Curated annotation (Swiss-Prot):
Protein name: 1-deoxy-D-xylulose-5-phosphate synthase
Subunit details: Homodimer.
Species this chain originates from: Rhizobium leguminosarum bv. trifolii (strain WSM2304)
Annotated cofactor note: Binds 1 Mg(2+) ion per subunit. Binds 1 thiamine pyrophosphate per subunit.
SUPFAM superfamilies named among the record's database cross-references: Thiamin diphosphate-binding fold (THDP-binding), TK C-terminal domain-like
């Protein structure tokens, strides 16, 4: 294990109040030490590295200038919050990031008063900040509210809805646009910094306020003339922007790694701003760590790594990942069917659609962080006879539910939804768990809902989705590697609404939806050994259900247990509804539904999370024994 970095200045800073005692000339050294601390911590835990390294100076400057936590500081998404955590009383736990019982990898209200708003999904900061700014006005409190949002998050419509509303309300809100991709405009050196300072200073802001007061005094007839004069002055100084059209006073771009640029602007805004202000700051992802600077995409999210070389720890997989199996199967099918297109919302690598883009660049679309648009865009393609695969993580599909209902399901359009990261996802915790997709999709008429039990089943479901044109269809699969089954050369087309029995028994029936099948088979071994002959089936479909299979289980077994890595209201609830409506519960059938517990489960390794939820081998056996009034045999479910 490498030695901890030497951080004499950072050792003096536990909270932002300590930071404010430092001289401006000390801050560059503090930034170097915060970077060293963060690099060392993430090298031991893994996590999001590049984004945090890019905002070290910005984070220090904000905490130096503003009176946090009384002034509210909100980070969008939260990938960049590690320096913030180091400076807000959590440095002693920074090497527990994303570990069980450790610090969250995102901002979290329950963790610190310095996290006024939790985040993990994108583009929420301006809306939340606006709510807090209006609350401060209603309370007649002069606290400032600062929302830090990345240029990537600005691709989502919600950010613009909030900007539009903030401008209309003339809210006292500070938005800092962290442009770490140089995608909007780079700073142009000393002149840019000077103009930004000038634009944020008392003179120009005073003119703007004077214009408002004069308009109020003389009436609206003079408003257009004053507006033209103010806009001319603003455009002359900084260049007119769409943010200004929305009512924001726009400053920048400025160098986000220069305290000489950041501190004067932030102080001017703190002391003079009365309406909404947007500060455009340009930063470099991975700043200060050469491997991350050279390959920002590879160091966005990292495993544990060697600080000296940057080499990340790699565990040799026992089987291909579900994501790679999906990608390979989709490319295979797209080679045979030129109507197949892929859609991703800023996650081409995470969803595997980068492979489709490499093979068929004109048939793969990255729409940015815009899940709502992605789904309706897919609906438009489907309406014209294409076969769109809108590949989204389960947690992000939630963001587009109205589009799934209104634009896809009601119209019966055959949009295909590959749902990645289904179930527990481990270190990213409850904000990224794939908990609810089965529950919210099975409520929709005409929607086919599948889950892959293993990587071979996933390949079958890709081909099934290609062949299915009668309406929308989804298939879910987890993060991580498969179980190591033999793989078909090409997937088979499954019969819609038909499951499969993988082990015959007579007393207990385990009906699995998804990848809990492997644990069901292990549990069946223990139950057989305890004298409880057990049937195991892979449901494949939560909608439509395999009614014949369920009736067979109900009539020929003493007990039925459904098992799924999803929330209450999903597959098990669909089975229960069917059994109830058919009168199959009237003769004493014992039935239990194993689902994710009705809590927000904290980060841990997925296997530990499944064990805690009772969804593993031991939990299934224990549920059977309790339902049958038997004690848990020592060594069977232990």
């Amino acid at each position: 294990m490498t030695q901890l970095p030497k951080t004499p200045l950072l050792d003096q800073v536990t909270y932002p109040a300590d930071l404010r005692k430092l001289e401006d000339r000390d801050l560059p050294q503090l930034a170097r030490e915060v970077r060293d601390e963060m690099i060392d911590a993430v090298s031991r835990t893994g996590g999001h590295l590049g984004a945090g390294l890019g905002v070290v100076e910005l984070t220090i400057a904000i905490h130096s200038v503003f009176d946090t936590p009384d002034d509210r500081l909100i980070f969008d998404v939260g990938h960049q919050c590690y320096p913030h955590k180091i400076l807000t009383g959590r440095r002693d736990r920074i090497r527990t990031l994303r570990q069980e019982d450790g610090l969250s990898g995102f901002t979290r209200r329950a963790e610190s008063e310095y996290d006024p708003f939790g985040a993990a999904h994108s583009s929420t900061s301006i809306s939340a900040g606006l709510g807090m700014a209006i609350a401060a006005d209603l309370d007649k409190n002069d606290r400032r509210v600062i929302a830090v949002i990345g240029d990537g998050a600005m691709s989502a419509g919600m950010a613009y809805e909030a900007l539009n509303n903030a401008g209309a309300l003339d809210a006292r809100l500070i938005v800092i646009l962290n442009d770490n991709d140089m995608s909007i405009a780079p700073p142009t050196g000393a002149m840019s910094a000077y103009l930004a300072r000038l634009a944020s200073g008392r003179t120009y802001m005073g003119f703007r306020d004077f214009g408002k007061k004069l308009t109020a005094y003389l009436g609206k007839n003079i408003d257009r003339a004053i507006t033209r004069a103010v806009e001319h002055a603003r455009g002359y100084v900084t260049g007119g922007t769409m943010f200004e059209e929305m009512g924001f006073y726009h400053i920048g771009p400025i160098d986000g790694h220069s305290f000489d640029h950041l501190l004067p602007v932030l102080r001017n805004v703190r002391d003079n701003a009365r309406g909404p202000v947007l500060i455009h700051v340009v930063t470099q992802k991975g700043k200060g760590y050469p491997p991350a600077e050279a390959a920002a995409d590879k160091y966005h999210g990292v495993n544990k790594f060697d600080v000296i070389t940057g080499a990340q720890a790699r565990v040799k997989p026992n089987a291909p990942s579900y994501t790679s199996v999906f990608a390979e199967a989709l490319v295979q099918e797209a080679t045979l069917d030129d109507k197949i297109v892929g859609i991703t919302a800023a996650m081409p690598n995470g969803t595997g659609l980068d492979k489709l883009a490499e093979a068929f660049p004109s048939r793969c679309f990255d729409v940015g962080i815009a899940e709502q648009h992605a789904v309706t865009f897919a609906a438009g393609l489907a309406a014209e006879g294409y076969k769109p695969f809108a590949a989204l993580y389960s947690t992000f599909l939630q963001r587009a539910y109205d589009q799934v209902v209104h634009d896809v399901a009601i119209q019966g359009l055959p949009v295909r939804f590959p749902i990645d990261r289904a179930g527990f996802v481990g270190a990213d915790g409850p904000t990224h768990a794939g908990s609810f997709d089965t529950a919210f999709l099975t409520t929709l008429p005409g929607f086919v809902v599948m889950a892959a039990a293993d990587e071979a089943e996933l390949k079958h479901m890709v081909r099934t989705a290609v062949a299915y044109d009668a309406g929308p269809i989804s298939f879910r699969y987890p993060r991580g590697e498969g179980v190591g089954v033999d793989m078909p050369v090409r997937g088979e087309i499954l019969r819609i609404g038909k499951g499969r029995i993988v082990k015959e028994g007579t007393k207990v029936a385990l009906l699995s939806f998804g990848t809990r099948l492997a644990d069901c088979l292990l549990a069946a071994e223990d139950l057989d050994a305890a004298g409880l002959s057990t049937t195991v089936a892979d449901a494949r479909f939560a909608k439509p259900l395999d009614h014949d299979l369920i009736r067979q289980f109900a009539r020929h077994h003493e007990m039925v247990i459904t098992v799924e890595e999803g929330s209450v209201g999903g597959f098990g609830s669909q089975v229960m509804q069917y059994l109830s409506s058919e009168g199959l519960l009237d003769n004493g059938l014992k039935i239990r539904s194993l689902v994710m517990p009705d809590i927000w489960m904290e980060q841990a390794k997925p296997e530990a999370m499944n064990a805690h939820a009772g969804l593993d081998r031991a939990g299934i056996v224990s549920t059977v024994f309790r339902a049958l009034g038997r004690g848990v045999a020592v060594g069977v479910a232990g």
